[in-house]
Amino acid sequence: MNIHEYQAKEILRKYGIPTSTGLVVTKTEQINETIDKLNTEVYVVKAQIHAGGRGKAGGVKVVKSKEEAKKIAHDMFGINLVTHQTGPQGQKVKRLYIESGCDILKEYYFSIVFDRSASCITFIASTAGGVDIEEVAKKTPEKIVKFSVDPATGLQDFHMRGIAYELGFKDNQVKQMKEIVKSVYNAFIETDATQIEINPLIVKTDGDLLALDAKITFDENALFKHPNVTAMRDYDEEDPLETRAANAGLSYVKMDGNIGCMVNGAGLAMATMDIIKLYGALPANFLDVGGGADCERIKEAFKIILSDKKVQGVLVNIFGGIMRCDIISEGIIAAAKEIDIKVPLVVRLAGTNVEKGKKILSNSGLEIITAHDLADAANKIVEAIS
């Protein structure tokens, strides 16, 4: 789960990490009053969306007067901001964060993430801050340093010292950086985050360190432990179909293709998407109905898939283990009758009660194309929509 920058900074401040000060705006009528409350010479108006690249897209503006700040805030609120992470459709700006500007001596990058390949927690730091870290990794990888932390032993003093020295800090800045590293680590562990990113972490002209921007992502499986974090969720920033699917116990991710996929199991779902592309088409979604799906969940899955107007055909690929093929077939038929599916539907079944499931489909009287294996299914759905 992602949260907004102003929420991330609120969490960091609770852990003693210095951040820039500001106020959030959720309605246009709050803009003038909010800006009047800020006692500063420089105003920074920031669009709050769950995507990076805001600055390059015009979602971050720096001005030196109240009137300019008010005009820019009014102009920015409600626009559709398109960045390299939002896709061409963009994201509507429904919140602004207006904060005090500050003089910057140097910018750094600092983050903590789960390194799944190494099964450990990893700090990532760079002297090239304020820019896309992926670009730094591609063009100047030598500017990035990593420190891995064994979960069994936890954060040690040598980790904190090492990060501070690698970034070139000296004297009091080393002490400040060690405190930031420790606080970020504690926040990461205690909130069940999967990423905390400060970009940029700056050195001000007075030599002090400050988190100028912040991003935090949380493990959704641990949200039940953190009602205060869950309360920060902004459903306006999430795909409504993905939210609807989650509420139905389905794992759904919308994509850009035209063939809807309904599969049980994440691995099989990814294999299904791969083979659709292999046969010359593109998947419209990732949808895992899970191992315990019933007729109602199957119907809801179809409704979600077909609510995407780009879908020209649907491929159902089920391996019956815990979930029996006859139950799946009954759910498919019930959904087809209720929804009136008007696009080609290809079904491939294997596993528990597969023959029973195929018989139910063949006796249904519906226009359902059956396939005997995955390659046959992909070939048939691609042919059907061509």
Swiss-Prot record:
Catalytic reaction list: succinate + ATP + CoA = succinyl-CoA + ADP + phosphate; GTP + succinate + CoA = succinyl-CoA + GDP + phosphate
Residues binding ATP, per UniProt: K46, G53, R54, G55, E99, C102, E107
Example GO BP: succinyl-CoA metabolic process
Source superkingdom: Bacteria
Oxidoreductase among keywords: no
One Pfam family matching this protein: Ligase_CoA
Quaternary structure (record): Heterotetramer of two alpha and two beta subunits.
Name of the molecule in the record: Succinate--CoA ligase [ADP-forming] subunit beta
Organism annotation: Rickettsia canadensis (strain McKiel)
Gene it is expressed from: sucC
